Amino acid sequence: GQTLKCRAVVLATDGPETLRLLGKPAAMASQGELCLYFAAPKAPINDPYLILNGEGTGVINSLTVPSVVAASYAPAGEALISVVLIGHLALDDKTAESAVRKELNEWFGPVVEHWRHLKTFRIQHALPAQPPPIPDPTVPAKPVRPGIYVCGEYQSVPGIQWALLSGRHAAEAVIKELAETPG
């Protein structure tokens, strides 16, 4: 319930929320995902790779082992495994976990039975739908209204690196605007 006065604002939210905050119809299409986390006695891979499912079948899109990058990401003495399913938001947690375990068993064998499910996250707007033409991610940010900037991957190419670049562009534009218009 507090109002703050400022000269510039950066909306760093997903596309539908940005549209809502700007008072525009939230008609932005996006792709949802499920992300399941497991703790395992031993990592299934020992390298910091993103494993993509190239089979064209199954529910799993990708798998990573974040604890290979930083052991502190996992519970003490265990490995942290992250499994992503694109779409499949209609699956309840138990069904999703069962389907993932079945598929992981085909990939890594019965060792998967010893993995402990930690949590399932449902990310409604994980990736924006971006039919061509896709905006150039290297173009500097411009205000959508005086003093209001937006950033996020829906502004350019889907992916965390482009979301971060979009944020940098918005920050640089705000710094420039504030330097040019003292106030």
Question: Residue locations for each model-derived region?
Answer:
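Mid-domain catalytic core of redox enzymes
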Residues: 1-98, 102-107
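Conserved flavin/dinucleotide-binding core of flavoenzymes
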Residues: 71-183
